[in-house]
Amino acid sequence: MSELSRVSVTALKGVGEAMAEKLAKVGLETLQDVLFHLPLRYQDRTRIVPIGALRPGQDAVIEGVVSGADVVMGKRRSLLVRLGDGTGVVSLRFYHFSNAQKESMKRGTHLRCFGEARPGASGLEIYHPEYRAITGDEPAPVEQTLTPIYPTTEGLTQQRLRQLCQQSLAMLGPESLPDWLPEELARDYQLAPLDDAIRYLHHPPADADVEELALGHHWAQHRLAFEELLTHQLSQQRLRESLRSQRAPALPVAKKLPKQFLANLGFAPTGAQQRVGKEVAYDLSQPEPMLRLIQGDVGSGKTVVAALAALQALEAGYQVALMAPTEILAEQHYINFQRWLEPLGVGVAWLAGKLKGKARVASLEQIAGGTPMVVGTHALFQDEVQFKNLALVIIDEQHRFGVQQRLALRKKGVGGLMCPHQLIMTATPIPRTLAMSAYADLDTSILDELPPGRTPVNTVLVADSRRLEVVERVRAACAEGRQAYWVCTLIEESEELTCKAAETTYEELSSALGDVRVGLIHGRMKPAEKAAIMAEFKQGALQLLVATTVIEVGVDVPNSSLMIIENPERLGLAQLHQLRGRVGRGSAVSHCVLLYHPPLSQIGRQRLGIMRETNDGFVIAEKDLELRGPGEMLGTRQTGLLQFKVADLMRDADLLPAVRDAAQALLERWPQHVSPLLDRWLRHGQQYGQV
């Protein structure tokens, strides 16, 4: 049998060209990819819950008889179906429904449903449940194993993903998926066989310890996390070694431009900015490529340090490229750098995906012709982008870019021979205990001081039952001339459903706040649409912005002083901290309301309590590491510090010492296993030798 890493998903039944394209969107190109695409969480559909025992926020299978189905004309037309089982009654609410669907819900119909119970206008409600009619006297069987919920994308249902996993699991074996951890190593570190771990995680038995799985502490997760962290460690060592052998332009410490820049800035850099600025200046003056990470809390002034680094290269006559992960953020950097550099006589060019036709050609010509400062998005990675003499690359939010993209920029250095220096900025604080393991290939600087004028944000926890009070608070803030964000984080495994939730919230708030100008921004809108809405919000034409978490990185609207975050219990603390950093940028006192769905677990309450107690990102990251709440510890994997499939740096911190030892042993005794591991876990793994 072929190795599954070489078998395309098109070998699976039901996967044609169109489905293969959808699968590629979530990184699934081979059967090995499918098997390593692990569930985000599990649903227990192995038992039927009496309707009378349902609690708000609970996912459950229920069975009952329809007592009525009516089309209700509220803010949105919906179908409301009443379902009872003798212990209680629940309402099923459908916003998108057909006449046939309405007809199938006649009084007396016996239904089995699955969904999340939520408080609604008619008591407990389940929005858009999965359901089927039950006929005959025989009770329909329930599921035998826990039901996996996978990360997905538009047009790719959970049902379809489960079928594809089922087919792939049927082909799983030691020949089709070799175990690259030598037996002796696996024995020393008490690691289970690879195929056992994968089978278990796709189909945990009904009696599996759900809490242990939610925590990520199960032996099967432990096995895969260990292998992934081991591979990451090996790749970092290769990166470091290859970097030491490369040359970069040595840039003398600049005098003239930084002096003018700081004089125009209007405020003195903080002590932390000066210290980190010196570290960067020293690195740039060396003939080896700098590879430095600046960690700075939200609002700590990383961009000013980046500008000082840029001026050192610019004064020496070289080009600088600054790259951001989204067009909104890149455009913000472009505006800032234009404002700062053009008075110094330094030209700034712009390149993003939305730039088309003549404007794009003109921009490419400027870059090739040597325009000193270039700001853009991923578009800067493309082959057709040629620099004249690039000496420094500044990357904002490193975790959004893969290793192959870093490679592409490396190759754009001076004359293609020298390697540009790289300065990477992140506002995702890494606990100090993990920084060394997270970025073994980078030198790290920390900006641990906020510039004067930043006001701490007051954070409060409010239960969803008080939603109307929160809406009134938004109305009052807007009436005072302030602006507000309302962030929807409803459903973590599906961008499509989260966007629908945002649309529903937008309609509800527009209706409730008739006189307030409300905008909507979510991940499925085109970049141009997002940029237009963002610009309106920034200019004050919109007072309230309903958004999904697309706004978490770097958006700067100083007049916004109120943020509402729905379902904060579903997000990692680092991500909540990023979102909260969008307010408190002006002089007004700012507030963040965490609108949660009770009941909160004890750890959930503790975690959200940390957000209330502190505005310090590093403290928050350390506390997150200590708590690791069950099912709620969304650490660095999801917030994007490093794109791990299984491992989570915070959760798996205790594995790191053993992982380092195992990496050493593998390099010394089984070096032939290193490349297959890199290929398995890191796309383009073979290129690690050249990064």
Q: Locations of the language-model features?
A:
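Long, highly charged, low-complexity intrinsically disordered interaction regions
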Residues: 1-13, 21-24, 231-232, 242
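C-terminal accessory region of SF2 helicases/translocases
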Residues: 599-691
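Upstream accessory/linker segments immediately N-terminal to the RecA-like ATPase cores of bacterial MutS
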Residues: 72-264, 636, 669
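OB-fold nucleic-acid-binding modules
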Residues: 37-67, 182
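N-terminal pre-Walker A segment at the start of P-loop NTPase domains
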Residues: 267-277
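Inter-lobe coupling/hinge segments of SF2-like helicase ATPases
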Residues: 247, 275-278, 289-610, 669-673
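Short, surface-exposed secondary-structure boundary micro-motifs
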Residues: 65, 116-117, 235, 568, ...
